[in-house]
Curated annotation (Swiss-Prot):
GO biological process: one example: nervous system development
A GO term, aspect molecular function: sequence-specific DNA binding
A single cellular component GO annotation: nucleus
Taxonomic source organism: Rattus norvegicus
DNA-binding region: 54-129
Similarity-based family: Belongs to the nuclear hormone receptor family. NR2 subfamily.
Subcellular location: Nucleus
Region named Disordered: 1-50
Sequence positions bearing Phosphoserine: S35, S41
Self-association and partners: Binds DNA as dimer; homodimer and heterodimer with NR2F2 and probably NR2F1. Interacts with THRB.
Record-given protein name: Nuclear receptor subfamily 2 group F member 6
Gene designation per UniProt: Nr2f6
Amino acid sequence: MAMVTGGWGGPGGDTNGVDKAGGSYPRATEDDSASPPGATSDAEPGDEERPGLQVDCVVCGDKSSGKHYGVFTCEGCKSFFKRTIRRNLSYTCRSNRDCQIDQHHRNQCQYCRLKKCFRVGMRKEAVQPGPIPHALPGPAACSPPGAAGVEPFAGPPVSELIAQLLRAEPYPAAGRFGGGGAVLGIDNVCELAARLLFSTVEWARHAPFFPELPAADQVGLLRLSWSELFVLNAAQAPVPLHTAPLLAAAGLHAGPMAAERAVAFMDQVRAFQEQVDKLGRLQVDAAEYGCLKAIALFTPDACGLSDPAHVESLQEKAQVALTEYVRAQYPSQPQRFGRLLLRLPALRAVPASLISQLFFMRLVGKTPIETLIRDMLLSGSTFNWPYGSG
C-alpha cells in the first residue's frame, strides 16, 4: 500500500512533504483502469496506437491502448503516470518497495506502480504540462443572500465556475433546529443528518457539469464521494452536527462483550468530529467549500466511468478555480490553499460505513446508504424522504 506525499521523486527514493496538487487522492480499493473501448483522452506527443495489434500493458499486463510516453500501456497506467508527473506527486511504499504490480493489484501501491513505470521506460519528459487556466469574470459578490456565516466576497471577481458552484448550494435553514449554539437531541441530530444527506445529493444534481454526465456516471461518482461531501456539508451547516448525543445513546445500549468494538467505534467517531472541527477552525468560506466538494465529487478513479479523462478535467477545473480564488481573496495566507487541499485525504479516511451507522441506522436500518443515494439522485424532487421537507 502507498500513501501520497508531496513533490515528485524518481524510482530511487521518496520525497517528503505534502501532495501539492491534491491529486485525485487515489483510492486503494478503486480501479483507475482504462477507459472503455472507444473512449478518448487527451493525446500527448509520442502517443501511438496500433490498430489490429494486440499488445499488453508493460506496467500491469492489461490490454494496452497504444504507445504512451515511450512504451505500450493501458489507459489506466497512462493516466496514473501523467497525473503523477503533472501534479508533482510522490508516494511512499508501506511494504518493502517490491509490491506486485499487475491488473488486479496496480492500485494497491502507487509507489511501486510508479517505480515500475520508470523501470519499463516511461519518460517523464514526454508528459506535457496541463492546460493553462483562464479565469472567467464573474460577479464580485456572489454569495447567496441569507447564507449563514457567509460574508459577500470583496476584492477581485470570482470565476464563473465558483459562481455556479455557489448557486448550487442549498444552504439548509437553521431555524428548525435553533441557533448555532443549540444542543440537539438524538432525534434532531439524525434529522439534521438526513437533511444534510439530501442537501448533498441536491447540490450534486445542480453542480456545474454534473447534470450533463451520463446517469450511470453520476451515480458512480456520488456513491464513491458521498461520505466526503457529507462531512463537508456537516462542517458548513449553520447548526453543528455534534456526535455526543449519538455516542451517549450507543453507550447506553453497548453490551459487555462489545466493549472492544465500542472503543474502536468511538475512536472513529472522534475522527469524524475532528475533521468537522478542523474545517471550522480554518474558517472555510462558501466558495472554498464549493470547490472542495467539486474536487471530491469529480474523482476520475470511480469504477465504470464512461470517460475518466473528462471527469479528471472537471476535477482540474475545480482545483484551478480554488487556486485562483484563494490567491486573490487571501493574499496574506500563502499556505491556505495547501491546508484546504490537505483536508480532502483526511476526509476520505473517515469510513463511509461509520457515517452510515452513526447517523442513518435509525432511519434506513440495513438498507445500504448507497442505494438510498442512487434513488434520491434518480428520483429527484419526487423522492419520498422519510423526514419530509417541512
